[in-house]
């Protein structure tokens, strides 16, 4: 019997395509300081296909899936994170100019990784409170279908 997994040790990583339209499998860098990853499990829309021959129940088929917009990663806003995000943004800009995408990996110990192509947004100011850790939200807009696959090397 398999044991349930803990979220301890999950890493958010990124890499750009070396070949356009091909998910990278190596060369991923870790984004330090990530505290929280939101749900990314979009439900499909439902399309009604009921016709006049149906006498009691409506019928539906699955439509498109919508991730609902940008994915917000809650992060500790410190120098190492800012350096990582700057590197990610610069790599994205360079790759984008060459027709290539940035890929995000959620590396989960004990199972396959979750990957998706994304467009990052520039950081703003995440706010502040008395006696609290300085945090921010780093936004990644999904730009393609996610996939479960073997963890990157």
Which role does the model predict for each range below?
Residues 2-77, 119-134:
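Solvent-exposed edge beta-strands and adjacent loop segments
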Residues 82-117, 121:
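Short, acidic/charged, Gly/Pro-enriched secondary-structure junctions
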Residues 1-7, 148-153:
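Compositionally biased, intrinsically disordered low-complexity segments enriched in polar/Pro/Gly
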Residues 87-92, 135-137, 152-153:
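Short intrinsically disordered coil segments
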Residues 24-25, 84-85, 151:
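A short, polar/proline- and glycine-enriched secondary-structure boundary/capping micro-motif
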Residues 105-148:
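Short beta-strand and beta-hairpin "edge-sheet" elements
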Residues 77-81, 145:
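Acidic glycine-/aspartate-rich tracts in secreted/extracellular proteins
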Residues 17-21, 111, 150-152:
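Polar, enzyme-active/binding microenvironments
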């Amino acid at each position: 019997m398999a044991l349930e997994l803990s979220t301890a040790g999950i890493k958010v990583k990124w890499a750009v395509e070396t070949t356009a339209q091909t998910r990278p499998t190596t060369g991923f860098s870790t984004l330090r300081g990530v505290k929280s990853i939101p749900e990314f499990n979009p439900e499909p829309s439902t399309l009604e296909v009921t016709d006049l021959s149906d006498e009691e129940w409506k019928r539906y088929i699955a439509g498109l899936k919508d991730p609902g917009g940008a994915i917000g990663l809650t992060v500790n806003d410190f120098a190492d994170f800012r350096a990582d995000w700057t590197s990610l943004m610069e790599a994205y800009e360079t790759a984008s100019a060459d027709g290539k995408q940035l890929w995000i990996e959620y590396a989960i110990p004990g199972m396959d990784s979750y990957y998706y192509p994304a467009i990052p947004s520039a950081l703003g100011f995440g706010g502040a409170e008395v006696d609290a850790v300085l945090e921010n939200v780093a936004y990644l807009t999904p730009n393609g279908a996610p996939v479960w696959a073997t963890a990157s090397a």
